[in-house]
Amino acid sequence: MIESDTIKLLRECDAGIKMGVASIDDVLDYVNDRTFFKCLVNCKDEHDKLKEEIQILLDKYHDDGKEPNPMAKGMSWIKTNVKLVMNESDETIADLMTDGCNMGVKSLNKYLNQYKAANEKSKDITKRLIKLEEKLVIDIRGFLSASKNNHFKWLLFGYFKNQTLIVFLY
């Protein structure tokens, strides 16, 4: 049970890191503020360091890791691009990053609870990843804005059997 939970927890961290790095990559070209840019790059570098640690452990268990859920990755890409089209600003990027980090923290805590039998090293990596996400949220708070232009309601409907996606904005 320990080995099984350890592998499952490491795989979820692996997928989460890949999702986080991809999300940062999606927005870096749009960041205007140099401090904000450096903050995101530093966070990405820290994610990459944790990814290396995870890969070493996954290799030890002869596991290839896990890719992010394609649906989640696609929805994230759509949300990012729609919001940036509506308002290409550091405030929008900070809002997107904050939402992503909060979702990551929530998911990682659920996995810690779910895979209680995982070894301490994998739990430690998960906790460090959670702290990294929480730190980014704190570091970018100054870029958040309450401006009306930065917030809009949106609703996504998908019909995926025939690969059709309809996006409604209001």
Predicted features by range, described:
Residues 1-7, 61, 147:
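Membrane-interacting alpha-helical segments
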